[in-house]
Amino acid sequence: MTSNRILQLEDLLKREISQIILSKVKDDRFKSFNIIDVKVASDLSSAKVYFSIINGNESDVPEIKFLEKFSSMIRSQVASEVVLKKVPKLKFVYDNTLYEANSIDDLLKSLNE
């Protein structure tokens, strides 16, 4: 698959996963997820879904067993919403970039005071 098509698939998955979390997920642990990026493997067998926690930090990230159960539920929802030959297996990966950036920003503000 061409890289342009992979980029389109990544964008589609990002939008669909975000929409599913907003509209269909009942578990409050996942309502604060902010999907940052999706990276699909070149063979389309898997995708890493990078997320952050809105107004949270790493201690707010659900345990791996919940993330695995969550990813299979989201994958089946994506399969029912989007016409794809094969929906990649999803792996949710916590991205703490925003949290780290806020920490650095707070540190810089405290130095200026």
Give residue ranges: language-model regions.
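Charge-rich, low-complexity N-terminal segments
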Residues: 1-46, 52-113
